[in-house]
């Protein structure tokens, strides 16, 4: 499953959330990560993120799509992490 994670997290917790997400997904731009995950991995990510945030102050959205080909991405302005198929 293809996952897109976006977050708005308090200053004291943002570095921990970002550092963790970098271990499981690809950084796209500020507060946005995406990548392919299995169902079990998605559950682990959700569980870990729940320990890192304050649910009274922070917000995380996880968009799940069955396949990346169904995601249509349009960028405006500079792309902070340009993805390329070149090796």
Language-model segments: what does each one mean?
Residues 30-59, 64:
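Short, intrinsically disordered low-complexity segments
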Residues 1-41:
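Extended, hydrophobic alpha-helical segments
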């Amino acid at each position: 499953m293809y996952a897109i994670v976006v977050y708005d997290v308090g200053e004291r917790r943002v570095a921990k959330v970002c550092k963790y997400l970098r271990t499981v997904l690809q950084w796209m731009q500020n507060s946005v990560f995406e990548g392919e995950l299995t169902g079990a991995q998605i559950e682990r990510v959700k569980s870990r993120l729940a320990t890192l945030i304050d649910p009274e102050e922070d917000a995380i959205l996880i968009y799940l799509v069955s396949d990346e080909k169904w995601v249509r991405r349009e960028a405006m302005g500079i792309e902070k992490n340009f993805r390329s198929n070149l090796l």
